[in-house]
Amino acid sequence: GGPDAGGVALHDFSTNSNACGPCPIALAAVQSADVTRYPDPQYTALKAALAAHHSVEPWRVVLAGSASEFIFRISAWVRQKGGSRVHLPQHAYGDYAHAAQAWGLQPCADVDAADLVWACDPASPTGQNHTGWPQVLERSTLVLDGAYAPLRLSGEPALTAQQRDAVWQMFSPNKALGLTGVRAAYAIAPVHAQSAAAALDAMAPSWVLGAHGV
């Protein structure tokens, strides 16, 4: 997905970036970002724009420094409120398990018994709809990773819009935009989780997004 100590790989088969390259409009916005000053610490305009894009109230938008940062933050929150078990997909982004281990959450095969449930739709690396949902979506903290939703070529999401309103939805646009070097992400909180959204906002560092992420 990028360079390592050996530099940029000649052939990279692990990349999760859009194969079509960077989106010209997004790239121009990043290049013109004002890096001489801090962003609005409340990110008022950004939250309003994302809320309008998803047709939700602004309080439901929780900004994050990256998908990985949000994964660690919500794992910490689940642990702090007494959760102890996490359900992971068979094939999944490694930071789900990394964050769980860091915060003492134990893997749980029973999706209906877990306190934190991770799902990716479409799934990576299969590109197929996620399977193995809890019987009651609202019972646990369920995070639906939508990183690859904009790259879906056919088919429909596994959950209806009403069902998605019952879970956390995490987005990291840098992948679909072909700009993986820009670290920025956000989540849409469940419609019933205003206090949880406020708690996760409170756990974020100041200026969680830099100018390029905004």
What are these regions (language model features)?
Residues 1-41, 49:
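N-terminal "arm"/small-domain region of PLP-dependent enzymes with the aminotransferase-like
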Residues 23, 169-214:
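PLP-dependent aminotransferase class I/II
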Residues 43-44, 57-84, 94-96, 185:
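Conserved beta-loop-alpha segment that forms the PLP phosphate-binding cup at the N-terminus of a helix
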Residues 61, 140, 166-167:
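Short, conserved active-site loop motifs that form the nucleotide-linked donor/cofactor pocket
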Residues 67-77, 81, 127-128, 144-161:
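Glycine/small-residue-rich loop that forms an oxyanion/phosphate-binding "nest" at active or ligand-binding sites
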Residues 80-81, 133-139, 160-164:
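Short, conserved loop/helix-junction motifs that constitute active-site signature segments
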Residues 108-154:
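Active-site phosphate-binding strand-loop segment of PLP-dependent enzymes
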